[in-house]
Every structure is written in C-alpha cells, then in structure tokens.
Amino acid sequence: MPSSKPLAEYARKRDFRQTPEPSGRKPRKDSTGLLRYCVQKHDASRLHYDFRLELDGTLKSWAVPKGPCLDPAVKRLAVQVEDHPLDYADFEGSIPQGHYGAGDVIVWDRGAWTPLDDPREGLEKGHLSFALDGEKLSGRWHLIRTNLRGKQSQWFLVKAKDGEARSLDRFDVLKERPDSVLSERTLLPRHGEAATPAARPARRGKSGGKTPMPEWIAPELASLVEQPPRGEWAYELKLDGYRLMSRIEDGHVRLLTRNGHDWTERLPHLEKALAGLGLQRSWLDGELVVLDEEGRPDFQALQNAFEEGRGENILYVLFDLPYHEGEDLRDVALEERRARLEALLEGRDEDPLRFSATLAEDPRDLLASACKLGLEGVIGKRLGSAYRSRRSNDWIKLKCQLRQEFVIVGYTEPKGSRRHIGALLLGLYSPDEERRLRYAGKVGSGFTAASLKKVRERLEPLAVRSSPLAKVPPARETGSVQWVRPQQLCEVSYAQMTRGGIIRQAVFHGLREDKPAREVTGERPAGPPPLRGARKASAGASRAATAGVRISHPQRLIDPSIQASKLELAEFHARYADLLLRDLRERPVSLVRGPDGIGGELFFQKHAARLKIPGIVQLDPALDPGHPPLLQIRSAEALVGAVQMGSIEFHTWNASLANLERPDRFVLDLDPDPALPWKRMLEATQLSLTLLDELGLRAFLKTSGGKGMHLLVPLERRHGWDEVKDFAQAISQHLARLMPERFSAVSGPRNRVGKIFVDYLRNSRGASTVAAYSVRAREGLPVSVPVFREELDSLQGANQWNLRSLPQRLDELAGDDPWADYAGTRQRISAAMRRQLGRG
C-alpha cells in the first residue's frame, strides 16, 4: 500500500531554501491522463542517469550508473532511491555544492509509460514490465530486482527484444543523443574531462570561431512530410540530381558524394570553378543537376551526361556553407550561413556554380507551381536552425509525386518489338537490423531505347540463378525472371503502393549510383515537424494531434508490410469513430495492444490496471469483482487515446451496461481450418444462416478481418449468460451432428482439420468479440466489416477490406447500412427452439 507521506524521505534530504529542486508541496495536476516517465542525466559525485516512472502520485526512481541501453543483452544496474515529486520530471538546473545530489541535472528523455501488468504487484514481486513512449527510449522494458546486497534495493534495467532494440556495438543511445530534450542543454565537463559535443541551438550574429578543418562533414538530410508545417521556414526548389559535398583545403578541391566517394576526376569543370572562388579552408553543400531546354532539372539527362562523358553540362547548385575559411558554421543559424554562401557566388551567372535561391511564395502555392512545371517538389528549412549531419526535422521535403529509389532484383525478357528488357523487378530492404529484401513490384514504362540497352548491359554481369528476395513472389506476378545481385539502384515514380507494398503505375527515371543498395528502405510521409520551443507542450518528439489527442512517434510503423504508421491508424479511428462507437459506446471494451506494431508482442487487456487513456471511462469495480475496473469507450478522444497507448483491436462484450447480467446478443464465430478454400467458408455461412432461419432468428453478418465470418444474433435482455451460451453451443453441436464432414463443435486445431469450428465460446460472461469496423492486428491491417446477406457470394475473403480500402467500401454503400435493422430486431430464445436443437 502506498505510504501516506511518500515524499517524506525526499524532503528530509533537501533544504528547499537553498536548492532549486521542486518541493512537491503543490501536487502537479494531471491533465493528460498519461503516466509520466523521464530520465535525468545527473552530474553528481559520479555521472549517472535517474530513471523515473509516475505511480500513485509520485515518481518511482532508480539511479542507473551507466545509463539505459537499447541492447537486450545488456543489463544495467538500477539502484532504487526515494520517490520524487511529479514536478521533478521537468527539473533542470544546478544543485549547489554541499547539498544532497550536488551537480548539474538535465532532462535527457521524457514521455509516457504504460505498465504491461499490475505495476504495484510488479514492484512488490520484483519484476516490473512496461512500455516506454519517450523521445529517445521506446518499446518494452523490464525492471528486475536482484539479490545483490546493498543499502538500497538493487534492480536491473533491461530492454526487451522488440522492434526498438538495437545492439550496443551498432548504436549507443547515450553517446549518439547526449543532450537535453527539454532545453537542448548538455552537461559541461568537469575539469580535465572531455565533453561529448552537444547539439546546441544555432547561434546568431557570430561565427563558430577558428577551428580545425573537418576531414568529413556528412550532409544534412530532409525528412519527407505531407504538408507544410507551421512556423518560420525558408523554401527552395527540390532538385532532381545527385547530392555533392565540396571540401577545399589550401585551394585543393575534392568533390565527395553523400557517402564519401570521390568524384573529383569525373567533374573537372566543377573542380576548376570551385578553385576559382579563392577559398582555402571550406566545405560547401549542394546538388548536381542538368537542366532541360525549359530550365528544369532532368535526372535522366544527368545520368546521360555521366555515361556519355559530357560532364560540362552538369551544374552544381549550392545551398549551404557548413564550414567557411576556418570557421565552423554548423552551429550558426541557417539564414546567416546562406547569406555568406550567396555573397560568395554573387556575379557568377555564367559559371557552373549556382545558388539555390529562397522563394518567397506561400509553400502550398509554391508546391502547386512546382508540380505543374513537372518538378520534383520543394525543400523547406527551418529558420534559425543549425546544420546537423543526419536526417533532420529542420529540413523537410514536399514531393509532387511518389518517387524514390528501388533495388533492382531482376528483369524479364522483352516481347514484341521491344528490345533488351521487358520490365525491371524491384525490391526494398526492411528498415530493421535484419535488412530483409522484399519484393516491391515491377516497372516497365519510362524507358528509352538507349536506357533499355544501358540497363541490360549494367545488369547482365550481375545475373544469378536464385532470387535475392526474402520471399519470392508468385510466377503469375513476375513471369519468367532473370534474377540479379541486388547492387544496382533505380529511381521510379509511381501512383500508389498497395497494402502489400507493391507499387502501381510505375515509371522509370534512371539508374542511381550515389548510395549503397542496402540503404534503400523506402520513404513514408511524416507529419509536420514540431515547432521549435514546442517541447514543453509535448511529452515526446515528433508528435501529431488527432481528435484532440497528441500522438507520440506518429511515424512508428504499425504494419511494415504496407508502411502503415501509428498516425495513420489514429487518423482512421478519428475518421470512423461514429461507426466504431455504435458497438463500443454502451459495452465493456477489451483491447488488443501492440506497442511495437503487429510484428511485436501483442497482449489482450480488459481491465484498467493503472492504464490511463485520455477520455476512457473506468467502470464500477463491482461489475467484475476482484479485478481492476473494466473499460468503456464513449468518445473519439478515448478511441484515439487508446491507439496512442498502443491499441490496435477493440473487442466488446455481448451485454450492454444497461444490464451486464443479461446478454443482448450471441455470436457464432465461424473459424476455419486455414487450408480450406474460401468457398467452403461461404457455404458454411449460408448453412448456418439457414439453420437460424429455421429457428426463427435473424442474424447480422460481418467479416472477421481474419479468416472467418461472424454471425451476430440480437436478443431481448431476458436470458442469463449460461442460458445463452448453452443455446449457442447447441447450435454448434447441431451443425456438427448434421454435417460432421463440414463442421466441428470442439475447439482446437486438431478438431477442425478440413472443417470449420462453430465457436460458441465467445458467449461466456467476460468473453468478447472484435467490434464492427475494428482494425485487426494482422498483416495488411484488415478491418472487420458488416455485410449484407445478399453480398455473401461476392465476398473474396474475410480480410477483403483494410483501413485504406474501407473508404471505397463505404462509398459503394452510398449510405446503405447492412445493420440498419439491428437495433430494432426483437427476438428471444424459446423452448421450441431448444427442442429443435435437441435440448428440450
């Protein structure tokens, strides 16, 4: 049981007249409904990290000497210390010498946490499992109490094996991301120690001072977004070319690709032009392009210029100056770096060096104009931002069409008058550490006679006998293929990507050779980047708001097979909340949660168990004695809030809150042997409906979103749980007796080989069925969709619709509702019905 004075030890150790730490006397009001989490980097007698989880009105706290680690193989000692007040999660400052914990403190990470089991029980038993949703740490974690001796309880902090885990030798989050998430501070080193370079805010009005010449500066990369963000931004045209960094030392010029390959010898005219700037120690950043007759960048022409030795046609459009004449400008504001660069290039209109001008138009108008002109899109850069050698939310790109690089995995032979190749087979690597190569479709248009010949010549030496793909697509999709080693990239535009990750209406634009094939994992538009200074309003980076709920990590993939993000899932639930709430609003709700997406661990949750979701209702504990409260979802806010906390599926009881002891429906879940053809499922559904017709009961149909069909039979609230379940079981057994070759009334895979199990078990008290219009946690994110009985013969599968194709389904219905008569259906179980089933 929580202490009546949980902060007594905290207060005893501190003199709040001297220390800036919060006293905790005024409890922090919780407006989000989320449980807070934070990690503070504390430079006390020894540098360590304080790990804190909100519970029962305080922050449970552990000192982690070596800090958190994303590697599940690494256990980090965590010494439990006194509880801290909730306000401490925002504390940054310097604790004076001579006081407890003297030294500097920054907020290294913060966000929300979700217990995966009862957290009080976990703390008592010594094993707390939870999910983090922070700016740096996320996914599932464990705190495990040890038997190590010490003055204080000693635990291990361990990362679980999930999609957020990373091996320590590949990524050390403490070294890679050392700074504050609250203020962009870094801890200063003690005397005689070296500090990790900090990601400081950009400076205005002064340079970085004379510093050693960097051997290499990796370029800053832009993040793909769907719409222009708010805030102060400068926009330029997006150039369809090759990224190039220029290093000038003692007047000697080197031209380097984004991966550090030296292209100086390939571009002597640019080497000469850059030398003509008279620079001695500088780095410049820009893009190689070739312009067509109308002055537009032409990627195919750029390739041809390299292939045909006509490099003099290549222009170098410069847009940044990260290092200038011995001064490191990476921490200087964007507009000041660009002003210096523009001055360098002034008056060189006939030169192959050009300046990428800032365009003053509204970004939406600018993008529309760029698209009309056939350009690739626009680039936005946040005013005041520093130059960072990584993909950044300070640089964004808005594209006119879906266009990206793909790995060529094979080609088909030409037909008819076409020569050299028919089509290219394309692949993309998975973004995880396993880097699996998956099939992404074909491209057969956009080629010229010359490019067909060139592509064939490039691919023939790469020919191999077997497919390089992790999963070979069916021959009907690919035809006869010559597979190749996955080394060559091409750039392709396309109209859409299907839920299976296959591109449609693809157009070839050229081969690429400026990056390794294994880097090509595909792009997915992100939400607008956060405003500078907006961190205090948000518990995590890269957030978006949907139905009034802030979505953390909006671009986290819920289903990599269709590149479906957490934000897309949240937006689906906001858009179709009215449909979902018809089933959810008046019933206890259970959740299927997958914080790491469908590929991670999934768990079923029917009780609150300290889970806080904005807008969700915790029901009277007396409804389910001996357990935490049941859950109820009444609003779009609660629905989207559940998605924010990792929920994917929503299940409901067969009784409403009007009378939880009297079910108002029963469900027959037709669950097939996976090997059965779909036709057998349709026949089984019709046979089950026929039996219900004979009994005088009307059923309403929906696809399960999985493999089977659900038949929902409304009832007047006259029967108890046992009576309803017994009746549903009688139907199941009756079908199995009549047609034992088709139906089974016994659960378990062994009992439904070649058959369909008529699952009646969902009719027990506390059992539940996936709600109508709920997404399923399966590949493709299918949806459980109501259908008319007359549509049965035309159904193609139980997973026919998913979160992206449901809008088309609803448009086709044009307002017709397959369940329009559901609420008005009045029927009950009679003695005559029982006798028909042999239960008289």
Swiss-Prot record:
Mn(2+) 2 binds at D240, E376. Changing R778A: Nearly wild-type templated dNTP or rNTP addition (in Pol domain). Residues 536-546 have a biased composition (Low complexity). ATP binds at F604, H651, D671, S704, G705, G706, K707, G708, M709, H710, S768, R776, A777, R778. InterPro entries: DNA_ligase_ATP-dep_C, DNA_ligase_ATP-dep_cent, LigD_ligase_dom, LigD_PE_domain, LigD_pol_dom, NA-bd_OB-fold, NHEJ_ligase_prk, NHEJ_LigD. It catalyses: ATP + (deoxyribonucleotide)n-3'-hydroxyl + 5'-phospho-(deoxyribonucleotide)m = (deoxyribonucleotide)n+m + AMP + diphosphate. The record marks H84 as: Transition state stabilizer. CDD domains: Adenylation_DNA_ligase_LigD_LigC, OBF_DNA_ligase_LigD, PaeLigD_Pol_like. Pfam families: DNA_ligase_A_C, DNA_ligase_A_M, LigD_N, LigD_Prim-Pol. Residues 549-793 are annotated as: DNA repair polymerase domain (Pol). Changing H710Q: Nearly wild-type templated DNA synthesis (in Pol domain). Changing D83A: 57% ribonuclease activity, 50% 3'-phosphatase activity (in PE domain). Changing D50A: Loss of nuclease and 3'-phosphatase activity (in PE domain). Changing D671 to A/E/N: Loss of templated DNA synthesis (in Pol domain). With Ku probably forms a non-homologous end joining (NHEJ) repair enzyme, which repairs dsDNA breaks (DSB) with reduced fidelity. Acts as a DNA ligase on singly nicked dsDNA, fills dsDNA gaps (3- or 4- nucleotide gaps, prefers a 5'-phosphate at the gap distal end, prefers dNTPs over rNTPs), has DNA-directed DNA polymerase activity (templated primer extension) and DNA-directed RNA polymerase activity, adds 1 or 2 non-templated rNTP (or less well dNTP) to ssDNA or blunt-end dsDNA (primer extension). In the N-terminal section; belongs to the LigD 3'-phosphoesterase family. In the central section; belongs to the ATP-dependent DNA ligase family. PANTHER family: BIFUNCTIONAL NON-HOMOLOGOUS END JOINING PROTEIN LIGD. This is Multifunctional non-homologous end joining protein LigD. It comes from Pseudomonas aeruginosa (strain ATCC 15692 / DSM 22644 / CIP 104116 / JCM 14847 / LMG 12228 / 1C / PRS 101 / PAO1).
